[in-house]
């Protein structure tokens, strides 16, 4: 049976895992790393880069490097490269395509299905965008599950005792808190809260602004206006943040960061953990609001939580850990890898769906209330937040005016009393209502939330039986046609990437063939080898060198094949000469070794390890 992968599609980094027997295993990518930077870049020659290689060139190519695209999921944001505009779904699909390809290489089989995680506080539009990204990448997304829930699944799979846990998930761009009850193989979310605009990126930004302000005061130059300098500053800020989790002081040294009339200027700053904590104190405090909200919604006190799980790389920040410790009055649980646990949970859920893991039931909730706009601009809730999903709820409404023959259903998500202050998910019209006094027609509005947290709405005139149904498509969602077009483009880009890689391999092989051929010619000197064989190799080297100067890859390949053939003949001649010269000595040695009384003797051989 084909494997289903679990993917944590993160703001900063992404991770892939798969079930290996009864245990989830994180898969290394092509570079040998367990996490892949969620970075996409386009070179000036049109090549697409994803992951570590894209992140590495960001300083020299800031305008064409895309980071933290997850923060724009479900919005109308576009990335403009040359004459093309890419949606967040398309950029995310490029990341997913790499994760998929690397997993296929590691597992040695084709991957077509996945479970992808999203922040618990993602809206319907953001969830739909994530699912679309998976589709564009050539994946059937079996389930969209919440990151904290996935983490709890990975933590609690082998835990037999009943317990109540709180997952504190602070990632690169989002923050979630979920409270779950675990017991008897059931994982039930009872409350969730969060902030989709709070994460490690914001902590980095505080360091960037602090350093840029100090530099501007000293040199009169605002580094934030220089894209290359700003990218260097961002990378240095992220590095400093990470270092300050294990040391109390770090140095930020950026030579030649800018130029003045007097010449180059450098940045050499020291940042202490105390200063970093001062710069980010309000961000740490901002995590406490959703934490209190989740506890309030669950009707619990901090002391009633058995374990607090820290998830997401940003929970390594000491001030964050201290805030959690102080709030709950206990040490947070650190027995899980905060970077990998979400992907591992997704892999477990994938195995549950496929039937490979049994006796596990996952009950998640909707993070925000859902409803429609009614008379006076009021937001009327049909499904309250923290309702277990999947769920279905219906309510009867009527017309607001005499003789009204159609109604507009304005679907919203949020917690405010007035519709104008909540997020619009979509609108649709139910028409063909027979004219009648207001309040007489009966219109049944039904909300249906599936296991992915995606909303389906229907409106039915009970008098005529006429019904209108929609799966919510926000204004930022991609249409079926747009998704199909994006899939074709993604496939074309994948083919182009493969072609470029193959071309690079052909050129590398040609270069290596020339090097080895020239080395072989030197080795053949003075060995009495037929000069015509040496001349043949020399004659075959030049066409390869000439072909490498051009763009015709087939010419390079053909020239390399001819060189390889000539090298083979020369190598055979050298081998024959060397072999015949050593025949006599070898025979004598064999005789000596074979002499004696016919007894054999065991010998112990030690292999010298050249790497040591």
From Swiss-Prot:
Please name the SUPFAM superfamilies in this protein's record: Actin-like ATPase domain, Heat shock protein 70kD (HSP70), C-terminal subdomain, Heat shock protein 70kD (HSP70), peptide-binding domain
Modified positions (Phosphothreonine) in chain numbering: 174
Q: What does this protein do?
A: Acts as a chaperone.
Positions of the UniProt region annotated as Disordered: 579-612
What are this entry's molecular-function GO terms? Answer: ATP binding; ATP-dependent protein folding chaperone; unfolded protein binding
HAMAP family registered for this protein in UniProt: DnaK
Checking Pfam families in the record gives:
HSP70
Family according to the record? Belongs to the heat shock protein 70 family.
The UniProt keywords, alphabetically, are: ATP-binding, Chaperone, Nucleotide-binding, Phosphoprotein, Stress response
Q: Where is the composition biased (Basic and acidic residues)?
A: 603-612
Which organism encodes this protein? Symbiobacterium thermophilum (strain DSM 24528 / JCM 14929 / IAM 14863 / T)
Concerning what turns on (or off) its expression, the entry says: By stress conditions e.g. heat shock.
- Keyword Chaperone annotated: yes
List the biased-composition ranges (Gly residues). Answer: 581-597
The molecule here is called Chaperone protein DnaK
The uppermost taxa in this organism's lineage are: Bacteria, Bacillati, Bacillota, Clostridia, Eubacteriales
Top-level division of the source organism's lineage: Bacteria
């Amino acid at each position: 049976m084909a494997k289903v992968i679990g993917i944590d599609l993160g703001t900063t980094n992404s991770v892939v895992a798969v079930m290996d027997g009864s245990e989830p295993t994180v898969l290394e990518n092509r570079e040998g790393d367990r996490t892949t930077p969620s970075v996409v870049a386009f070179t000036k020659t049109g090549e697409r880069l994803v992951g570590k290689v894209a992140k590495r060139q960001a300083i020299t190519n800031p305008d064409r490097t895309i980071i933290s695209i997850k923060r724009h999921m479900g919005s109308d944001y576009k990335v403009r490269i040359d004459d093309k505009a890419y949606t967040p779904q398309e950029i995310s699909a490029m990341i997913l395509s790499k994760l998929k390809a690397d997993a296929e290489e590691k597992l040695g089989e084709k991957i077509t299905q996945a479970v992808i995680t999203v922040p618990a506080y993602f809206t319907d539009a953001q969830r739909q965008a994530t699912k679309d990204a998976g589709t564009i990448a050539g994946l059937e997304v079996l389930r969209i599950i919440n990151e904290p829930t996935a983490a709890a699944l990975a933590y609690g799979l082998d835990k037999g005792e009943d317990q109540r846990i709180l997952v504190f998930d602070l990632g690169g761009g989002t923050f979630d808190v979920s409270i779950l009850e675990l017991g008897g193989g059931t994982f039930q979310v009872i409350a969730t809260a969060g902030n989709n605009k709070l994460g490690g990126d914001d902590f980095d930004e505080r360091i960037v602004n602090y350093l840029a302000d100090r530099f501007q005061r000293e040199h009169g130059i605002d580094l934030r206006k220089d894209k290359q300098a700003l990218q260097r500053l961002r990378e240095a800020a992220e590095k400093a943040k990470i270092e300050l989790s294990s040391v109390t002081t770090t140095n930020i040294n950026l030579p030649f960061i800018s130029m003045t009339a007097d010449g180059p200027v450098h940045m050499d700053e020291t940042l202490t953990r105390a200063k970093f904590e001062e710069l980010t104190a309000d961000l740490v405090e901002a995590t406490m609001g959703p934490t209190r909200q989740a506890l309030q919604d669950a009707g619990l006190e901090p002391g009633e939580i058995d374990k607090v799980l820290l998830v997401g790389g940003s929970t390594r920040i000491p001030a964050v850990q201290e805030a959690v410790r102080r709030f709950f009055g206990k040490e947070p649980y650190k027995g899980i890898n905060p970077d990998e646990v979400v992907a591992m949970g997704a892999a477990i859920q994938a195995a549950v769906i496929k039937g490979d893991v049994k006796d596990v039931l996952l009950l998640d909730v909707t993070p925000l209330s859902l409803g429609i706009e009614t008379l006076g601009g009021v937001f009327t809730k049909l499904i309250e937040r923290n309702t277990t999903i999947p769920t279905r709820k219906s309510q009867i409404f009527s017309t607001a005016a005499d003789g009204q023959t159609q109604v507009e259903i304005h679907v919203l998500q949020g917690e405010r009393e007035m519709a104008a202050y909540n997020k619009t998910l979509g609108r649709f019209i139910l028409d063909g209502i027979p004219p009648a006094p207001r309040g007489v027609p009966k219109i049944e509005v039904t909300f249906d939330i599936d296991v992915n947290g995606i909303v389906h709405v229907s409106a039915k005139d009970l008098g005529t039986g006429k019904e209108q149904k929609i799966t919510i498509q926000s204004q930022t969602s991609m249409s079926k046609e747009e998704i199909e077009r994006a899939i074709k483009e993604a496939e074309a880009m994948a083919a182009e990437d493969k072609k470029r890689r193959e071309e690079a391999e052909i050129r590398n092989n040609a270069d290596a063939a020339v090097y080895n051929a020239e080395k072989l010619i030197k080795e053949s000197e003075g060995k009495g080898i037929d000069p015509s064989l040496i001349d043949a190799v020399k004659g075959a080297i030049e066409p390869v060198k000439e072909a490498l100067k051009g763009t015709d890859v087939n010419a390079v390949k053909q020239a390399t094949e001819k060189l390889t053939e000539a090298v083979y003949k020369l190598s055979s001649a050298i081998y024959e000469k060397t072999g015949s010269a050593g025949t006599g000595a070898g025979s004598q040695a064999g005789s000596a070794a074979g002499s004696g009384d016919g007894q054999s003797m065991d010998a112990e051989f030690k292999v010298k390890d050249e790497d040591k």
